[in-house]
From Swiss-Prot:
Disulphide bonds in the chain: 33-104
Originating species: Escherichia coli
Source organism superkingdom: Bacteria
Annotated transmembrane regions: none
UniProt keyword Signal, yes or no: yes
Official protein name in the record: Heat-labile enterotoxin IIA, B chain
GO molecular function list: toxin activity
An example Gene Ontology CC term for this record: extracellular region
Amino acid sequence: MSSKKIIGAFVLMTGILSGQVYAGVSEHFRNICNQTTADIVAGVQLKKYIADVNTNTRGIYVVSNTGGVWYIPGGRDYPDNFLSGEIRKTAMAAILSDTKVNLCAKTSSSPNHIWAMELDRES
């Protein structure tokens, strides 16, 4: 069994057992994002994960299948932050398992800055 299938099965089982993976944007996620100045971007299929250690760049980026680019805090801004590390892990799991995500992202920055991410297995 390929590692991609194993990770996909793991993500799916974790979602089923924990009840934390929703079809569409969950009410809890919507409430969290509504408390910020960010906007919800639903049903994003991430395809690329870019980690750049160049001192002139921000560090971690994800790219969707439609070409959208988002920045994950980390690298230069919060290198040891546990929560931004969890967003990076969620992004990698979504890419490896072909699972869509819902993003809470600040659209006034370029690239858009991700503040929260939710796996969305049935979008």
